[in-house]
Amino acid sequence: MSIVYINIFLAFIMSLLGMLIYRSHLMSSLLCLEGMMLSLFVMITLIILNNHFTLASMTPIILLVFAACEAALGLSLLVMVSNTYGNDYVQNLNLLQC
């Protein structure tokens, strides 16, 4: 395993830890989720290029499409919550409240 793969894997782990530690604000959770998607994209692209998988060459593009949809939904949810409650705390997203 080369140093590039280890660095990308560490970037994914750091984003995952950031998601677990800074989960009180929605904006920080969205940024950590985008970091995870970026590291997954780079890792999948490098694996496909190094191993010459021609059949899986569309996989990074599909991952980018899902990441863009996730970012759009996350930002719209952030705008809705901040307009409704005035802050971006994740505790405001509890759907079981009356």
Curated annotation (Swiss-Prot):
Subcellular location: Mitochondrion inner membrane
Keyword Translocase: yes
A biological process from GO: ATP synthesis coupled electron transport
Catalytic reaction annotation: a ubiquinone + NADH + 5 H(+)(in) = a ubiquinol + NAD(+) + 4 H(+)(out)
InterPro entries to which the protein is assigned, alphabetical: NADH_UbQ_OxRdtase_chain4L/K, NUOK/Mnh_C1-like
Broad class of where this protein is predominantly found: mitochondrion
Residue ranges of the TM segments: 1-21, 29-49, 61-81
Membrane topology: Multi-pass membrane protein
Protein name: NADH-ubiquinone oxidoreductase chain 4L
Gene source species: Herpestes javanicus
Lineage: Eukaryota, Metazoa, Chordata, Craniata, Vertebrata
